[in-house]
């Protein structure tokens, strides 16, 4: 993973950061540039880039960044989109009336963004699956299992379903031991299931 720097204080920042730990400048990932941007917030939906090479551009935070703090990507301010290139791929999330579900969702989105960063670097970034007949798009469902409705992680026709319980470290480690696996990670699930998606294209 590439290291980045804050345009305000030059401190090193990381892909997951939403604020510089040194000067508290707002940060966000600019997907079109494959770069972390530093921003001055003129309003909740108008952020001015402080990076010299982006100073003529205006951005806004992804809806899930602004309202749920589960994302740190930004979108061009003039765009009609409200979701970033990562969040737009997520079709279903756990119900948010349970605080644990918000934590699980956040962890899943974080792992998905790391996976998508790699896809960007390889120039095979997936696009959203807008309807069931679209064989080239990709969609993610993050589902919580229920007593009579277990959730199996897998891929089918451009839809990747992940058991959101995998974001619970205890559940995931218990499953790893039960399955006799050397390791079991959220990022690994994204890589594995996306392999089926790309193979089918």
Q: Residue ranges of each PLM-predicted region?
A:
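Auxiliary, metal-adjacent structural segments of Zn-dependent hydrolase domains
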Residues: 103, 107-169
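Residues forming anionic-ligand binding surfaces in small-molecule and nucleic-acid pockets
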Residues: 84-93, 164-175
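Short, solvent-exposed loop/turn and secondary-structure capping segments
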Residues: 21, 96, 173-175, 199-201
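Generic detector of contiguous secondary-structure segments
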Residues: 16, 147-150, 184
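Short pre-active-site segment immediately N-terminal to the catalytic Zn-binding motif
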Residues: 169-191
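Active-site recognition of the HExxH zinc-binding catalytic motif
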Residues: 20, 184-201
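Active-site-proximal structural scaffolding
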Residues: 13, 77, 108, 155, ...
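N-terminal low-structure segments adjacent to metalloprotease catalytic domains
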Residues: 1-129
